[in-house]
Amino acid sequence: MAKILITEDEDSLRSFVARALRLDGHETEEAADGAEGLEKLRDGVYDLLLSDIRMPVMDGIELAHQAKSAFPALKILLMTGYAEQRERADDLAEKIVDVVSKPFALPDIRKAVARALAA
């Protein structure tokens, strides 16, 4: 299956999503903020970046810009619980696959990941 980097500052959500995606057969790695996520992207090869938008150190918008510049083929799926953050992601339409609204149910994030990987 796919190798997915999950970048989310909320520990419980990050590990919850990682466990669910591993049950689907994906390999997952985790990062707690955008800077750590970018470092992991530079050290590995990933099929998908699944990132929260609102995080400390480096937010998901900046991470998406830098990740897409360094890795043009990388698929990016963002998550947010804030409407204004979703609007900020509109500028990334050419760089990301979609934005998933939080809170979400497990079937929702699994479907979003499957769609992103198929895109």
Where are these regions (language model features)?
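Conserved phosphotransfer cores of two-component systems
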Residues: 42-44, 66-74, 89-94
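Acidic catalytic/metal-coordinating carboxylates
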Residues: 33-36, 59-63
